[in-house]
Amino acid sequence: MDTVLEVKNLSVAFQTVLGEVKAVRDVSFTIKKGSVTAIVGESGCGKSVTAKSIMGLIKKPGKVSDDSEILFQGENIQNYSKKEWENYRGQKCSICFQDALASLNPTMTVGKQIMEKIRVHKKVSKKEAWNEAAEMLAKVGIPNPEIRMRQ
């Protein structure tokens, strides 16, 4: 089975007025093609910080340790340019945040929001984006995707 993602010795710290807070300490795991992986733990244990690190979303005052390695298909992604991060986030890897209200716009339909991301990253027509979005909803088990797209 091919390795898709490998995280080695991930450590993330944040500078606060009280000093450095280590949010993630020496986390390592591998995700193989075709496998399902869950990051589980109690509140505040670093699940979201780990996921954000993989997505390149840790910003100051946070910092991923220089000793950490995040390899996507064997390539170290930590030094990606802005353009490379945009391509990675849109084409290769995605994240679904737990708090839907913080991540989704309640004034737009689900379909429109998914289509928007598809069109930004794939440069396809509205119809193609609609079909792909509906297919994505069906793949994750959402019933009646054509109806849900309009909600």
Regions found by a protein language model. Give the residues of each.
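ABC transporter nucleotide-binding domains
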Residues: 1-151
